[in-house]
């Protein structure tokens, strides 16, 4: 069996209300455990529309047929009206996810705000965003928050140093090839990172691959991954508009000997055996703007 970490990003109110129950049902049907990362504060995702002025983001929205993929409820959230607080209304679904045996972690307090502003927020603002998210998720699930994955992979060393204070068991804040121990600015080692290694649906659809051929494409990518494969899905896509296609992917993956698992299951017992690395800003195929990306560091110890 080839073990693949399955990360579920929950970005929006609709994705929580509609996509989470659909995925919980699917995972129960196929006996799959995954890692869910919840956005818990205001759903302001519609405020991303100003990014249509940027050619790369406009092309992404056009090639993925975003209106059909996400629906206008998601695309306009938090524009003409205040964004709905996700955990306040839908916290029981977060608790249900944990009770079903899935790993539950923090994605963001304000997903859109993090993606748009993290690069210019002060340290105090970063701390506040993480603290608000941790408090809301812990109140919803009734258990401590032990892992996190920042919105849009917008992380760098400064973000990692802020998150260090929350005592997470691991973070999944960047793109890369294998788990590692990040080196912080003062030379200390930060919380273990488990990078996402595989392309997401919205990064490649309409450019690298057609809708009909996506499952073939991602299964090849999984088989060819020579690192520690981690695949990210979104409740707004694989749990809603593309749920039928995703179920076919799960069926085919089982037949090919692919075992999906929570991200923590990818870690060795001895975390000190993991290589060193850094999280640095870099452009990334299929995405607009910078992402946190893994770079290797030689261990001279």
Curated annotation (Swiss-Prot):
One of its GO terms (molecular function) is hydrolase activity, acting on carbon-nitrogen (but not peptide) bonds, in linear amides. Residues 2-261 form the NodB homology domain. Keywords: Antibiotic resistance, Hydrolase, Lipid A biosynthesis, Lipid biosynthesis, Lipid metabolism, Lipopolysaccharide biosynthesis. It holds the Pfam family Polysacc_deac_1. CDD domains: CE4_ArnD (cd10939). Pathway: Glycolipid biosynthesis; 4-amino-4-deoxy-alpha-L-arabinose undecaprenyl phosphate biosynthesis; 4-amino-4-deoxy-alpha-L-arabinose undecaprenyl phosphate from UDP-4-deoxy-4-formamido-beta-L-arabinose and undecaprenyl phosphate: step 2/2; Bacterial outer membrane biogenesis; lipopolysaccharide biosynthesis. It catalyses: 4-deoxy-4-formamido-alpha-L-arabinopyranosyl di-trans,octa-cis-undecaprenyl phosphate + H2O = 4-amino-4-deoxy-alpha-L-arabinopyranosyl di-trans,octa-cis-undecaprenyl phosphate + formate. GO terms for cellular component: membrane. HAMAP family: ArnD. Catalyzes the deformylation of 4-deoxy-4-formamido-L-arabinose-phosphoundecaprenol to 4-amino-4-deoxy-L-arabinose-phosphoundecaprenol. The modified arabinose is attached to lipid A and is required for resistance to polymyxin and cationic antimicrobial peptides. Belongs to the polysaccharide deacetylase family. ArnD deformylase subfamily. This is Probable 4-deoxy-4-formamido-L-arabinose-phosphoundecaprenol deformylase ArnD. It comes from Serratia proteamaculans (strain 568). The gene is arnD.
């Amino acid at each position: 069996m080839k073990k693949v970490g399955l990360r579920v990003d929950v970005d929006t109110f609709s994705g929580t209300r509609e996509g989470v129950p659909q995925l919980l049902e699917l995972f129960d049907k196929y006996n799959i455990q995954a890692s869910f990362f919840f956005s818990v504060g205001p759903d302001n995702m519609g405020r991303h529309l100003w990014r249509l002025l940027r050619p790369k983001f406009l092309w992404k929205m056009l090639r993925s047929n975003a209106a059909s993929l996400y629906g206008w409820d998601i695309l306009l959230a938090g524009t003409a009206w205040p964004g709905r607080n996700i955990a306040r209304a839908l916290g029981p679904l977060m608790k249900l996810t944990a009770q079903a045996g899935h790993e539950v972690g923090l994605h963001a307090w304000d997903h859109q705000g993090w993606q748009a502003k993290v690069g210019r927020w002060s340290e105090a603002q970063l701390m506040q965003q993480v603290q608000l998210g941790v408090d809301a998720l812990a109140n919803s699930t009734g258990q401590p928050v032990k892992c996190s994955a920042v919105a849009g992979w917008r992380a760098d060393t400064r973000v990692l140093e802020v998150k260090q204070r929350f005592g997470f068991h691991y973070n999944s804040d960047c793109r890369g090839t294998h788990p590692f121990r990040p080196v912080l600015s003062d030379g200390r080692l930060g919380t273990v990172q488990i990078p996402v290694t595989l392309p997401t649906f919205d990064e490649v659809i309409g450019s690298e691959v057609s809708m009909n051929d996506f499952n073939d494409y991602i299964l090849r990518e999984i088989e060819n991954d020579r690192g520690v494969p981690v695949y990210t899905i979104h409740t707004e896509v694989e749990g809603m508009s593309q749920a039928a296609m995703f179920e076919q992917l799960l069926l085919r993956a089982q037949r090919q000997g692919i075992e999906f698992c929570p991200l923590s299951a990818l870690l060795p017992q001895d975390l000190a055996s993991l290589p060193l690395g850094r999280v640095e800003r870099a452009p990334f195929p299929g995405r607009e703007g910078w992402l946190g990306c893994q770079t290797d560091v030689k261990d001279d110890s």
